[in-house]
Amino acid sequence: MPTNIYVTEEELKKQEKIMKEIAEENKGKNLYYHIETYGCQMNVHDSEKLAGMLEKMGYKYTENLEQADVLLFNTCAVREHAEIRVLGRVSQMKELKARNPNLIIGVSGCMMQEKNVVEAIKEKYSYIDIVFGTHNIYKFPQLLWEALNSQDIVIDIIEDTKNVIEELPVKRDSNLKAWVNIIYGCNNFCTYCIVPYTRGREKSRKPEDIIAEVKELAQKGYKEITLLGQNVNSYGKDLDEDITFAKLLYKLNDIEGIERIRFMTSHPKDISDELIYAMRDLDKVCEHLHLPVQAGSNKILKKMNRKYTKEHYLEIIDKVRSNIPDIAITTDIIVGFPGETEEDFLETLDLVERVRFDAAYTFIYSKRAGTVAANMPDQVDDAVKHERLERLIELQNKISLEKSAELRGKIVEVLIEGISKRDSNKLTSRTRTNKVVHFVGDESLIGKLANVKITETKAWTMQGELVEVIR
C-alpha cells in the first residue's frame, strides 16, 4: 500500500479528461448507478461526490439494483456489526452479477483501508470489479475506466494524501441542506477507534475554499449547512494562518442566504471558550452541540485515551448551558469497554442523570483489529454488555421524553424540510435544537422558516401547528 502521496493538478486534470471520455462513450445510452452508504455523515458526503462523478460520466441514479450498470458500496469500519452487514450485503450481489455480467460492482470506504478486508474481497468475492479506499475518491473515473476495459479486479488503496482535494463534482441528496467538509482525518487515537487508521491524519481545508463552497450553496438556494469533521474543533491547527474553528464560524455567519449553520463532531478536550462564545453570539449557528462523552468513569476514559475527566466534561456542560440556556446537547456512549466494572458503568449512568442529554447514541464496545483496546485484558462478557446497554437506553429514553415535553405549548422556529414520510398531509420540519416537528401544511412552504406551536411530544419527534411563516 503506497504511503502519503501528493495529488497534483495534472492528476486531477487527467481524471477530468477520463470523465469526459466516459461521458462521450455513454452518450445516447440509458445507463444507471446505485450507491449504498454505510456509516457516518463523512461517508454520506463521500457518496455524494461519487454520485457527482457518475452523473458527470453520463449515469443516472436508480433505486432499482436490477437496473444498475454501476453499483457501489461505500463502507464503514467503526464497528464490527457494520462490517458484517456490508459483507453480507455484498455476498448477495453474486446472483445479480451472474444475471448481468456487465454490471460493475465497486466497494469503497473505510473498510477497504483494512488489509485483511481487501484480502478477503480478493479471495471470496471474485465478482467484485473495483476496490478503493477513503483517500482516492478523486481517482474513481480512472478506476471505473480500468474496470470497464479489463476482466481483472481493480484495487487501488493508498494510506493518505498530503493535500486536500478540492472541486470534485457533488450530487447532493438535498437541495435545502448540505454537508460541507472542513477537516479530514483524526489525530486523537482513542484506543477503541479505527478512524485515524482509515481516514488518516488531520488535514484542514483552506478557509477561502470553504467560504467559496458555502457562498455557492447559498446562491443555489441552500438554507442550512452542516460542517463536517472527525473533530471540527481541531480545524486550522495544521494551517499556516491565524484561523480557528470559531473564527471560521464568524466568517460563514456573514454569508447572505444561509439561514442555519450546524457542525459535528466535537471533541471535549478541544472545546474552547472562544467556540462557546461564538455559538452564543452568532445568530445562524444552531443551539445544538453533539459532544461525545463515551463513558462516565475516569478510569475508563483514561483507558480510552480521551484526554479529559468526568469532572472536566461536566464543567464544559455547565459553561455551555450558562452561555446558551436553551441548547440541546447530544452525545455518544460506549458500554462494555475492556475493564469496565459495574461501578464504572454506574459512573456513566450518574453522568447521564446529571447532564440530562437530549439524546444519546449508545453502542456496545466493538473490538477493532489494529486498535490498542483490541488487545486489552478484561474484555467484558457479551451478556453483560447487552444488559448494560438496555439499562442505559431505558434511562436516556426517559430523559429524552422529559426534555421534549418541556417544549409542549411553546412556539419554536423550524426549517421546513419536506413532506412527512408517515403522513402525506403533513410537513416535516426541524427546530434549531435539531428536533423533528410534523405539522399540517402546504408543500409550497418547503424551504421556508416558520414558527410552529408544539402540541404533542415524543422522545425526539413532535407534532405542531403552524403559527406563521417567517421567510
UniProtKB/Swiss-Prot annotation:
It is found in: Cytoplasm. One of its GO terms (cellular component) is cytosol. It is an enzyme of class 2 (transferase). [4Fe-4S] cluster 1 binds at residues 40, 76, 110. Residues 405-468 form the TRAM domain. Its cofactor is [4Fe-4S] cluster. It comes from the Bacteria. InterPro entries: Elp3/MiaA/NifB-like_rSAM (IPR006638), Methylthiotransferase (IPR005839), Methylthiotransferase_CS (IPR020612), Methylthiotransferase_N (IPR013848), Methylthiotransferase_N_sf (IPR038135), MiaB_methiolase (IPR006463), rSAM (IPR007197), rSAM_horseshoe (IPR023404). Keywords: 4Fe-4S, Cytoplasm, Iron, Iron-sulfur, Metal-binding, S-adenosyl-L-methionine, Transferase, tRNA processing. Its EC number is 2.8.4.3. It catalyses: N(6)-dimethylallyladenosine(37) in tRNA + (sulfur carrier)-SH + AH2 + 2 S-adenosyl-L-methionine = 2-methylsulfanyl-N(6)-dimethylallyladenosine(37) in tRNA + (sulfur carrier)-H + 5'-deoxyadenosine + L-methionine + A + S-adenosyl-L-homocysteine + 2 H(+). Residues 31-149 form the MTTase N-terminal domain. Residues 172-402 form the Radical SAM core domain. Binds 2 [4Fe-4S] clusters. One cluster is coordinated with 3 cysteines and an exchangeable S-adenosyl-L-methionine. One of its GO terms (molecular function) is 4 iron, 4 sulfur cluster binding. [4Fe-4S] cluster 2 binds at residues 186, 190, 193. Monomer. Catalyzes the methylthiolation of N6-(dimethylallyl)adenosine (i(6)A), leading to the formation of 2-methylthio-N6-(dimethylallyl)adenosine (ms(2)i(6)A) at position 37 in tRNAs that read codons beginning with uridine. Belongs to the methylthiotransferase family. MiaB subfamily. This is tRNA-2-methylthio-N(6)-dimethylallyladenosine synthase. The gene is miaB.
